[in-house]
Amino acid sequence: MRSALSNRTPRRFRSRDWFDNPDHIDMTALYLERFMNYGITPEELRSGKPIIGIAQTGSDISPCNRIHLDLVQRVRDGIRDAGGIPMEFPVHPIFENCRRPTAALDRNLSYLGLVETLHGYPIDAVVLTTGCDKTTPAGIMAATTVNIPAIVLSGGPMLDGWHENELVGSGTVIWRSRRKLAAGEITEEEFIDRAASSAPSAGHCNTMGTASTMNAVAEALGLSLTGCAAIPAPYRERGQMAYKTGQRIVDLAYDDVKPLDILTKQAFENAIALVAAAGGSTNAQPHIVAMARHAGVEITADDWRAAYDIPLIVNMQPAGKYLGERFHRAGGAPAVLWELLQQGRLHGDVLTVTGKTMSENLQGRETSDREVIFPYHEPLAEKAGFLVLKGNLFDFAIMKSSVIGEEFRKRYLSQPGQEGVFEARAIVFDGSDDYHKRINDPALEIDERCILVIRGAGPIGWPGSAEVVNMQPPDHLLKKGIMSLPTLGDGRQSGTADSPSILNASPESAIGGGLSWLRTGDTIRIDLNTGRCDALVDEATIAARKQDGIPAVPATMTPWQEIYRAHASQLDTGGVLEFAVKYQDLAAKLPRHNH
């Protein structure tokens, strides 16, 4: 990674059109004038040095990313020392745990705001600060649309959580404790105590939830410095990584290496392979598709199918045992990518922000901790990729095979002669309010041969698509020790959940997808061997039910929700704003003057 300031090829950066434009000296004066009120000099802005934006996602309302309020000074130091001029600006907040009705609304909203900032202001390159789930794809989508040099800096996971000498992972402990509470095994106070124990420091989720998955994806795509994703937020290496990232973005600005130079089809295939091997979040599916679409790359169901046979080699909750600190010490994402490279499951010749190929970045990155990162041919589990399903209820859905536990496998997938095939009676809920109201209703007669179905949870129905598919069984089953039932829905589930749900079903119920005509009591047949999921309902009955119309969804509550509902795609195509994907390489043309 280059650090010397000499040997750089001089460039006229786009910011010069604002700050040093001899054809419009009056406009130059206007643009310069107000920046001086906080002490920056006109000589700095007219020096020809690149203006490096720092897209600040940290705030008090975004606690997973709040570490960036401290890290930003090290980013600034790196930029200054490498010969750039830093300019920090705020990004629309995204916080999965707290945002109602769902933070899925915020990914595209953050994307829109960031596109306007990067395109309309004198920014030559950008450091994308990331952490919580959707901050990573939102930033990458925007930087790709504008297509200025960009680099991703994760804030890193929290330290490992401990409760009574037991590792407790953020998010995952919520779903597991919720079941224990319903079964009468713990009190409400113990529930809160376990949850608090899982969050001992600054940082994002310390499990292999969506946050850790997407920051590892940024590395697999080649958009982060090697080893960036997994460094825990409080570690000294995190500040050092922030400094190095600040340095490197200046080199990228001079070299004019842009996202579209890096984000090839092969780069996205690398990301998909990484998600499988790490037991990553199912939310990676719409996010990877969305990033790819904004890069002009098509990712289809076949790309996910191609990675299905990749084994689970990362022993990290929710699919495994350990948490973020141990994963970092075991080598993090580079060690996982190294394993994939050795087996020919990674494109090693792709370009990355280091200026080197992926193969060059991974030299010497083999793990020394085989309790955390298993050998490829001695994995934690076989076939850990997302299982893609289709049938008369939807054209596309996925199932996270890496979290299929022994209890679930024995009960549903081990019938002699019918391994991997099961039938279940559908219990249909219209949204999570309906689920919470009726799940313990004795009239439903829910037993272990039922499948819980939730609809109205997709991009249009919710709106935004909600993490509600990982429904737990009714209390009477939990008290019998039955901790999970098959679940299905047109929404999503938390990446920290350990439920082998069928989710992201597209098209969703709210636009007439097959779940809209499903009824409680119908039999659903699921064949994991062929990737089929069908309701055993005859065509005449289906046609008659369709005449009843689509189940009602909640009213739109905000202007943005109205815009979102009018333009968002389905989860199989990334949940993007369909009108936005046609806008690419915006920085190739400067915006017109404002006066």
Curated annotation (Swiss-Prot):
Gene Ontology terms for molecular function: 2 iron, 2 sulfur cluster binding; gluconate dehydratase activity; metal ion binding; xylonate dehydratase activity
Function comment: Catalyzes the dehydration of D-xylonate to 2-dehydro-3-deoxy-D-arabinonate during D-xylose degradation. Can also dehydrate D-gluconate, with similar catalytic efficiency. Has weak activity with D-galactonate, D-fuconate and L-arabinonate.
SUPFAM superfamilies: IlvD/EDD N-terminal domain-like, LeuD/IlvD-like
Protein's name in the database: D-xylonate dehydratase
Subunit record text: Homotetramer.
Gene giving rise to this polypeptide: xylD
GO biological process: carboxylic acid metabolic process; D-xylose catabolic process
Pathway as given in its UniProt record: Carbohydrate metabolism; D-xylose degradation
UniProt keyword terms in alphabetical order: 2Fe-2S, Carbohydrate metabolism, Iron, Iron-sulfur, Lyase, Magnesium, Metal-binding, Xylose metabolism
Gene ablation phenotype (knockout): Deletion mutant cannot grow with D-xylose as the sole carbon source.
PROSITE patterns documented for this protein: ILVD_EDD_1 (PS00886)
Protein's UniProt keywords contain Lyase: yes
Superkingdom of the source species: Bacteria
Species this chain originates from: Caulobacter vibrioides (strain ATCC 19089 / CIP 103742 / CB 15)
Entry similarity comment: Belongs to the IlvD/Edd family.
Phylogenetic lineage: Bacteria, Pseudomonadati, Pseudomonadota, Alphaproteobacteria, Caulobacterales
Cofactor section: [2Fe-2S] cluster; Mg(2+)
Catalysed reactions, semicolon-separated: D-xylonate = 2-dehydro-3-deoxy-D-arabinonate + H2O; D-gluconate = 2-dehydro-3-deoxy-D-gluconate + H2O
